[in-house]
Amino acid sequence: MNRGRKISGGKYHKQRKRKLFERPSQERHAILGEVKSKKLRVRSGKLKTILLKSDIANIIIKGKAQKAKILNVIETPQNRFYARQNRLLKSALIQTSLGKAKITNRPTQEGQINAILIEENK
């Protein structure tokens, strides 16, 4: 069985190259550090803000948002090594100045970090 060949033995050829909207984007993960973001051109010429680094999170406490400084990444369910690298991903547990919190959004897609408080500092 030769992959990519016809029964006659000839090669299959692509009809066309990939279009811009079909190409995958570069994989990015926000990491802990001084706030740094980037704007990308997306479909129909709009701009999308992606987060590259951040040390601030919007934390929801009893229905009200409050900014807090991120101190450390405790755990990430995607990969335990991401926590060691201080990568900020959805549903990662982070240590903030207000206490432990869980990230509820996708920071690299939205350009900010939203989280809910799980455990308060005493």
Regions found by a protein language model. Name each.
Residues 1-122:
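Ribosome-associated RNA-binding proteins
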